[in-house]
Amino acid sequence: MSNSTSTPNTGLSYKDAGVDIEAGDALVDRIKSVAKRTTRPEVMGGLGGFGALCKIPKGYEEPVLVSGTDGVGTKLRLALNLNRHDTIGQDLVAMCVNDLLVCGAEPLFFLDYYATGHLNVDVAANVVTGIGKGCELAGCALVGGETAEMPGMYEGEDYDLAGFAVGVVEQSKIIDGSKVKSGDVLIGVASSGAHSNGYSLLRKILDVKNVDLTQVIDGRPLADVAMEPTRIYVKPVLELCKQVDVHAMAHITGGGLPGNLPRVLPNGAQAVINEASWEWPELFKLLQREGNVERFEMYRTFNCGVGMVIAVDANDAEKAIEVLNAQGEKAWKIGHIQENAESVEGADEKIRVIFE
């Protein structure tokens, strides 16, 4: 038996395990003003409750709720590498609300999930400020979220994001693609850049080819162009829906034009895209050139300058373009719909969408 005197054990705390409750509380205090700026009259109460309450807006006869969730992919890795955290939150909101918009829904509220190995309050506050800006652009309320500090799950201050949005649409005005017919015109709406898709290939090209991120393209450093936040189309497109009978919409995300257009096409309808109708932004030209990427691979990986495609009757096409342009968007005729018996659900994307 040892005669040595033992030192009394010191009790361990949650902070010793890597979780700083005070830092989490400080973050909540920092973001309350952000959430307040996004509030809507339907929201009941503020941040801090176990659940967020929201009324259905007045004026709906048969309201249908629409929900969606998304992330920002490996654009987040680029943000971490560049130490730029002020716009990635806007990307997160955009990816969710633009998806709701496709069926004609007005976004009501948004929640976020922020997970990290070690909470950096300044970084997290920057991210949430971007989320707030995105919510303001979309007209939806930031009603809550979750900040999870999980040591051992993430490396240092690296973090991951997820977003959740809920919107509402009148049942009789749901846009589901069922009206799409041969002769409809497809309208392209310009993207602001790569948005939040294709960044694994983008980063691979930049890394393998040692591309200089300070080089200037389109009058800006490449790093700025690559981090340009995803465009939020909510307000302009909802205005369009008030003035024009929209037959279908596709948010051009992962899978590009050939991967997303078929999601809103009825059987027997084939999308024909006129490649000469627009010029790829310099970012995509650079990526194709530096990576020697085959053209169709570019189309199925990146949006190539097209963030949204909208199908309308040919007689409404000019008005639709005028409405969108008046709202500050860049819109143009990008193609049309034609009949093709082989263009059915499950068919190869090269049959459902053709480029000419």
UniProtKB/Swiss-Prot annotation:
CDD domains annotated for this entry?
PurM
EC number per UniProt: 6.3.3.1
Molecular functions per Gene Ontology: ATP binding; phosphoribosylamine-glycine ligase activity; phosphoribosylformylglycinamidine cyclo-ligase activity
The alphabetized list of GO BP terms reads: 'de novo' IMP biosynthetic process; adenine biosynthetic process
Catalysed reaction, written as an equation: 2-formamido-N(1)-(5-O-phospho-beta-D-ribosyl)acetamidine + ATP = 5-amino-1-(5-phospho-beta-D-ribosyl)imidazole + ADP + phosphate + H(+)
- Location(s) in or outside the cell: Cytoplasm
Cellular component, GO annotation:
cytosol
What UniProt keywords are attached to this protein's entry? ATP-binding, Cytoplasm, Ligase, Nucleotide-binding, Purine biosynthesis
Which pathway does it take part in?
Purine metabolism; IMP biosynthesis via de novo pathway; 5-amino-1-(5-phospho-D-ribosyl)imidazole from N(2)-formyl-N(1)-(5-phospho-D-ribosyl)glycinamide: step 2/2
Family recorded in the similarity comment: Belongs to the AIR synthase family.
Protein name per Swiss-Prot or TrEMBL: Phosphoribosylformylglycinamidine cyclo-ligase
- Recorded source organism is Acinetobacter baumannii (strain ATCC 17978 / DSM 105126 / CIP 53.77 / LMG 1025 / NCDC KC755 / 5377)
**What's the encoding gene here?**
purM
